[in-house]
Amino acid sequence: MGATKFVLFIVEGETDELALGRALTSLFASGEHPGPRFGIVRGDITSVHALGAGNPASTIKRRLVDAVKEFLAKDKLRVTDLDAIVLLSDTDGAFIDDSLVIFDEDEPRCSYFEDRIETSNVASLRQRNQCKSSRLKTLSRTHELTCNKRKIPFKAAYMSRNLEHALSDCSGRVTQQKKYDLARKFSKKYGTDVIGFLELLTFLAPVGSYQDSWVYVARDNNSLLRGSNMKQTLEALPSSPIKAVSSL
């Protein structure tokens, strides 16, 4: 029998792992799969700031592979230890039409609503949306990454409009401390409640397959609405932990 493989989740920050780590570990364990590992890149690698405005969308694949290699080297693991790679990303309303990015001179950053984003820097936010949505579309059509000449199954999961909105129904601007508080609360509630966790993922999931979930979030203002395709992502993994659970 070969060595046990694990799923690597590439996430933006520590609160992603704090919120989802125990719940996902319990879910994987229910199907007798090893718990997932988390590689934290500390920032949105689909953004302009991470890759540069002039880089093509395909650059995101190279950045992802670099992040995987860094994680494996740090933990002294091999590519052959990977069962699959999952990128978890916030949508940040990136797929909305430019007309829904509204000027507000009193808003130094941006405020998110279900039907618009308000900001004092419209041009910059529209550019961010164009770059981020292009890269996410590329990833939604990517089904494997090549790392050290080995092809590893890949899926992209999204939280809409962000982790706090999707998991905790918190739609306002939150401080870093608030993010940690929400993540701890979520972990405490769902960390060992596999059925409850799956019920939430089912509630957040759009109708249809993994690919359908990306068609949905790219339509209209859906990337501003609360939702996630984590359920479809987990179902699409080679060793799906969801398929091992008999009931939802």
Predicted features by range, described:
Residues 8-20:
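Catalytic nucleophile-elbow at a beta strand-turn-alpha helix junction centered on a G-D-S/GDSL motif
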